[in-house]
Amino acid sequence: LKNTFAQKELFLFQNMLALLEKWDDDLSFDKVIFGTTDFEHVWEHMIDIAYGETGIFNKEDFFPYAEWHLNNVSGNAGNLYPDTICLFSQEKLHGCIIIDAKYYGYKDINYKTLPSMESIAKQIHYGQYVFKKASNFGIESPNTLIFNVFLIPANFSSKKNTKKPCYIGYAIEPWNDNEKMFEKIFCFAIDCQSLINNFSKDKER
C-alpha cells in the first residue's frame, strides 16, 4: 500500500511540475507595466489565467460553504474562495490541483515568512470539499487525487533555466495523520518576469 501511494504521489508531483513548466520558449517581452501598485492581486490574477481551467466549469462550484440552522430555518454562513483550480485526467488517475497564489518575497523564505496555519487549514479544507464532491466535477475514481500548492513569486533572471519552478518545501498539520494527498501543501517559487511575459502574450492573442 505504501509503495502504491508513493507511485501515485510521484505521478501527481510530476504532473504538477509539468503544469508549472508549460512556458513558451519564444517569449520576447522585455518589460511589462501594470496600471496598479497592488501587485498582490495582479499576481493572483496572472496565476489564475496561466493555470486555471477557464471556461470548462463554474469556479463557484468549488467554493466550500457553511450554514447556520436556527429553529428549523437554515441560512448561509459564507463561502471560502480558492484562487485557482486545475483538473487533470491521465490513464486511470483523475484529480484536481488547488493553487493558492501567495505574494511573498522569495529571498526571505523561512518557516516564519511562509503561509501561516490559517492559509494551510484553508487549503486542506478546499481539498476535503473537492474530494467529497469529486463526482460533481467528473474526477471520481478509485484513484482520485487532490493536490494542494502554494505559488510564490521569485526573480531567477540571473540563473539558468529561469522558467523552471523552484521547489521550496511543504506544509502539514503534524497532529493529523496526513494520509490524504491534499493534507500536504507543496510550495513552489515561480519566476515573476516569465509569468508576466506569458500572461501578456496570452492577452495579445
Q: Where are the predicted features?
A:
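Interdomain/boundary linker segments immediately adjacent to catalytic/signaling cores
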Residues: 1-41
